[in-house]
Every structure is written in C-alpha cells, then in structure tokens.
C-alpha cells in the first residue's frame, strides 16, 4: 500500500525515474541474469548544466525460488550536490507453500553524510482463496544520529474473478515526536 514498502526499501536506487524525461535500456540473459541502466531528469531535458540528472545501473539474478538485485544510482542534483545510492534486494520462495516467501531490501545513501534504510516482508501465498503479506521497514534512509522511524503493513489479497483482485490492508507509520499514522484501506486491481 505504501510506496516505501512497495519498492522493498530501495526506491532511491531501484525506483529511479518517471517524473520527467527518462531513457532506459535492459537485457535479460537466458541464464537468469539481467542488466539494466537508465538516465532520468525531473526537468524537461537531460544531460544539460541546468538539469538534475539521475543515472542508474542494476544487475540481477533470478532463479526458480530466489532472486537478488544490486542497484546503483547517482543523482547530481540541480545545484550540483551529488547523492549516490546503493540498493540490495533479495527474495526467497520455498517450494513448500506452507512456509512464507521472504523479501528484504537494504539501501545506503551518501550525500556527504551516510544514511541507510531497510525492509523485510513475508508472504503466505495460499491462505484461503488469496495470500497474506506482512512487512516492516524504515520510513526512509536515516543517519546514525537521526531517530529511525518504522512503517508496518499487513494485507490480504484475493481474486474476485479472473480480472479483478481485492486487497484490504492496514498500515502504521511511526512519526518522530508525534502521533503515529494508522491507515485502513481497500485496493482493487484489474487485469
């Protein structure tokens, strides 16, 4: 439901682009390896002195029961203040569906100070007609001297028919120095 949980805690390194001009290229090898790269800018131009360009690369390997991806992104910023990100995502799905699949992500950020964030999630793929997912992670990347806040999420997703899935869920976001934010929602997806 929430963006940070949806991108496995590595949205700055893996989820780059889409806000303005973006160009990407990728290739999936037969062996399960894939490589991708791209450039993006929230302004109307890329690779100019005025544009805040973001360059990114990703290498991934996917097998039948697991996958891992390593991503690098460099955001040169409109003022020339460069920020670099490294992200590592991994997932494992056991063959026995009684056990949950696990997904995890870890991201570092360097803009002159080091910050990091993480995510971990579990999904039981066969619970009644649907699946149950739970997850927890930081609400962003934090330096060592910042107060780290977390977000928690739980959802049940089930198909209504061949073209529609309903997903009710709940999330709790910790707020430093304030009341936590709690949300209950229902998402409908069409395919």
Predicted feature locations:
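A short, acidic, flexible beta-alpha connecting loop/helix-capping segment that sits on the rim
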Residues: 170-176
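Outer-membrane beta-barrel biogenesis signature
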Residues: 1-14, 21, 123, 129-131, ...
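Surface-exposed coil loops of outer-membrane beta-barrel proteins
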Residues: 1-58
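Conserved structured catalytic cores and adjacent interaction surfaces
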Residues: 140, 175, 183
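C-terminal transmembrane helix-loop-helix hairpin of multi-pass membrane proteins
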Residues: 153, 164-167
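Detector for outer-membrane/organellar transmembrane beta-barrel domains
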Residues: 32, 49-151
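Outer-membrane beta-barrel "beta-signal"
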Residues: 158, 180-191
């Amino acid at each position: 439901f929430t963006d940070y949980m949806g991108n496995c805690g590595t949205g700055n390194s893996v989820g780059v682009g889409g806000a303005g001009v973006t160009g990407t290229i990728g290739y999936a090898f037969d062996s399960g390896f894939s490589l991708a790269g791209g450039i993006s800018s929230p302004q109307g131009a890329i690779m100019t002195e005025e544009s805040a360009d973001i360059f990114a690369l990703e290498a991934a390997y996917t097998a039948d029961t697991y996958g891992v991806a390593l991503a690098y992104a460099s955001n040169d910023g409109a003022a020339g203040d460069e920020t670099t990100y490294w992200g590592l995502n991994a997932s494992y799905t056991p063959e026995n569906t009684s056990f949950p699949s696990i997904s995890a992500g870890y991201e570092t950020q360097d803009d002159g100070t080091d910050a990091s964030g993480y995510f971990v999630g579990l999904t039981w793929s066969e619970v009644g007609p649907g699946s149950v997912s739970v997850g927890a992670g930081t609400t962003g990347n934090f330096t060592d001297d910042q107060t780290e806040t977390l977000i928690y999420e739980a959802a049940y997703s089930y198909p209504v028919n061949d073209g529609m899935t309903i997903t009710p869920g709940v999330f709790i976001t910790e707020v430093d120095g304030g009341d936590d934010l709690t949300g209950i929602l229902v998402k409908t997806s069409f395919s």
